[in-house]
């Protein structure tokens, strides 16, 4: 429990930030899930749309500081690699 007014304010601010960060992280998870489902279906057009959406969502999360930029880059790289694998196998 906060003892001072400034500590109470910091607690309120932290709760607001946490709620915002959780929302952003949830969006990232949803975008990644949609991409993985598109990859599993084997639809190249849907996969490309989902990949673009996931990249955008992850990039925004990194720019807001929710994800570290290197972690975001690693996620995007791995997702792009996974999305490219079925396309390469089809050729």
Swiss-Prot record:
GO MF term (any one): small ribosomal subunit rRNA binding
UniProt-listed InterPro entries: Ribosomal_bS20 (IPR002583), Ribosomal_bS20_sf (IPR036510)
GO biological process: translation
Residue segments, region Disordered: 1-28
Disulfide bonds: none
GO cellular component labels: cytosol; small ribosomal subunit
UniProt entry tagged with the keyword RNA-binding: yes
UniProt keyword list: Ribonucleoprotein, Ribosomal protein, RNA-binding, rRNA-binding
Pfam families for the chain: Ribosomal_S20p
Family designation: Belongs to the bacterial ribosomal protein bS20 family.
Record function comment: Binds directly to 16S ribosomal RNA.
NCBIfam families: S20
PANTHER family per UniProt: 30S RIBOSOMAL PROTEIN S20, SMALL RIBOSOMAL SUBUNIT PROTEIN BS20C
Name assigned to this protein: Small ribosomal subunit protein bS20
Organism whose genome encodes this protein: Anaeromyxobacter sp. (strain K)
């Amino acid at each position: 429990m906060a003892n001072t007014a400034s500590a109470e304010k910091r607690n309120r601010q932290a709760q607001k930030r946490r709620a915002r960060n959780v929302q952003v992280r949830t969006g990232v998870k949803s975008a990644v899930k949609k991409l993985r489902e598109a990859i599993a279906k084997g639809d190249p057009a849907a996969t490309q749309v989902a990949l673009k959406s996931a990249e955008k969502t992850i990039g925004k999360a990194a720019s807001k500081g929710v994800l570290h930029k290197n972690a975001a880059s690693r996620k995007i790289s791995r997702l792009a690699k996974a999305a490219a694998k079925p396309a390469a196998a089809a050729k």
